């Protein structure tokens, strides 16, 4: 995925904004990989520049329970797209394109999980805006046929929204819900929105993502 963002998707963005001068050079792709069972993620815009956005449980905006200790790579997708907009020269190559905070995927090439995660938290937190960012991200990524083919290899696609009011299950509830379908796991609210039907994804709101 990182190589796609460095090359293929950069070219796609340029072609999508062909009325503007192309973005030249290598784009920055900020990423971190973890195989921790329990960890948090935090919006990098809320951290000091260069700080890790993968934190100890309870220290961030959303928690992951990665029960198989699978290596997961998280990419700062918002920051990635933002660099294509040259505000000084008004070259807004990604203007009005929804962008979630993170895109993540199984790092050991087993193609188990592909995740888009939007952290719509803080004083300006809005549910509708979060949904827009999720849809805009998966829709724009899959407009590129090469990226679309890559995403469709994954066994599960998760589109996750975390807001200030998202549910957070207790440890006991999490243990009890381990083998439940996603729509029955405590602390998960499934999102029903016809715009997502084409992507074959689990779309839900939660503060704690469970990956068996």
Predicted feature residues:
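Conserved catalytic cores of phosphodiester-cleaving nucleases, focusing on short active-site segments
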Residues: 102-104, 113-121
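Charge-rich, low-complexity N-terminal segments
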Residues: 1-79
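Short acidic, S/G/P-rich loop/turn micro-motifs used as interaction or catalytic elements
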Residues: 91, 121-125, 166-170
């Amino acid at each position: 995925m990182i190589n796609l963002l460095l090359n293929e998707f950069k070219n796609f963005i340029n072609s999508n904004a062909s009325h503007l001068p192309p973005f030249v050079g290598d784009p920055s792709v900020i990423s971190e990989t973890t195989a921790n069972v329990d960890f948090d993620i935090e919006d990098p815009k809320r951290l000091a520049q260069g700080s890790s956005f993968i934190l100890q449980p309870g220290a961030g905006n959303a928690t992951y329970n990665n029960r198989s200790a699978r290596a997961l790579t998280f990419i700062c997708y918002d920051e990635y797209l933002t660099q294509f907009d040259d505000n000084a020269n008004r070259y807004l190559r990604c203007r009005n394109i929804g962008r979630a905070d993170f895109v993540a995927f199984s790092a050991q090439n087993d193609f188990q999980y592909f995740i888009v995660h939007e952290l719509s938290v803080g004083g300006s937190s809005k549910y509708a805006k979060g949904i827009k960012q999720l849809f805009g991200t998966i829709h724009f990524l899959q407009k590129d046929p090469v990226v679309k083919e890559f995403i469709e290899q994954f066994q599960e696609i998760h589109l996750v929204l975390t807001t200030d009011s998202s549910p957070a299950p207790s440890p006991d509830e999490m243990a009890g819900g381990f083998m439940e379908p996603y729509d029955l796991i405590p602390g998960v609210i499934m999102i029903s929105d016809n715009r997502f039907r084409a992507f074959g994804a689990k779309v839900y709101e939660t503060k704690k993502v469970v990956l068996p």
